[in-house]
Amino acid sequence: MDEMSNVAKTTTETSGLTDSVLSLTKRMKPTEVTTTTKPALSNTTKFKGVVQQQNGHWGAQIYADHRRIWLGTFKSAHEAAAAYDSASIKLRSFDANSHRNFPWSDFTLHEPDFQECYTTEAVLNMIRDGSYQHKFRDFLRIRSQIVANINIVGSKQVLGGGEGGQESNKCFSCTQLFQKELTPSDVGKLNRLVIPKKYAVKYMPFISDDQSEKETSEGVEDVEVVFYDRAMRQWKFRYCYWRSSQSFVFTRGWNGFVKEKNLKEKDIIVFYTCDVPNNVKTLEGQSKTFLMIDVHHFSGNGFVVPEEVNKTVHEISDEEMKTETLFTSKVEEETKSEEKKGGFMLFGVRIQ
């Protein structure tokens, strides 16, 4: 009987102890949860070159040429990550694609062109003082004017109407240099475009094709040529002379253009030289002349102009259109004067 009493007493004490522990655990639980969920500052994030700061803001930095370069403080990690991407374009142009936080977009793909107008120090200063995005948007606005008002013609542009058919000084004019129908090898695994010699010698930068010079694997020299497409996107090609086939070719950069434009055999590539009128605003350091590359896709019914052209030309905000009235009115005037003369529409104007 005493033994049973002792067992019961022990059980009661144990139960009481257990209840006490459980009660203590329940009381401690909120404290433990609060402790584990308390945000802790970390020197690293999922973004490259971004660090969290004590005040809740985010810092951006980048390493280049064996030194750390501070890019500034930003309100969000995404802003800091974008600043890192912008800086990497200028500082790591040779492998910028492998050092990015965000994939290239229709917006950011124009950044390399924008940065070419400035020195490295100027780009870094704009990122630090917060003016980078504002100036980049100005650059895109000016570029949209070029896209919306460019005229592709075979010779000097003259307005059909107006004061005695005077030459327009408000429209951008382009002169066709040459065109080429693509062959199977141009869009095949060789990853190169052959430029006919008569055009290469006349319109492309000089590269010697002297057979007596010392040979290399592909040519004695090469240069980089820069073109813009309809959307004013920049395309860079390595231009060289292949002695093995005795041909002038585009190599590096051409394969990417083929894939982006979905080029096929029999498509036509057209090359132009374009002039920007003196009274049209450009950014400091920008040239008044540039080269353009255009694509005419082949279909069963002939050649067609890509639909995205009209989309690109007309996708301009109302506010921008108000500031561009001077330019668009000239294009509309020319279009109306040519409506009854046949031809086709290209870049918003009628071409004979």
UniProtKB/Swiss-Prot annotation:
Main location: nucleus
Biological processes, Gene Ontology terms: ethylene-activated signaling pathway
Compositionally skewed regions (Polar residues) per UniProt: 7-20
Molecular function in Gene Ontology: DNA binding; DNA-binding transcription factor activity
GO cellular component, as recorded: nucleus
DNA-binding region: 46-103, 178-297
Compartments it resides in: Nucleus
Family classification: Belongs to the AP2/ERF transcription factor family. RAV subfamily.
PANTHER family named among the record's database cross-references: AP2_ERF AND B3 DOMAIN TRANSCRIPTION FACTOR, B3 DOMAIN-CONTAINING TRANSCRIPTION FACTOR ABI3
Function statement: Probably acts as a transcriptional activator. Binds to the GCC-box pathogenesis-related promoter element. May be involved in the regulation of gene expression by stress factors and by components of stress signal transduction pathways.
Record-given protein name: AP2/ERF and B3 domain-containing transcription factor At1g51120
Organism listed in the record: Arabidopsis thaliana (Mouse-ear cress)
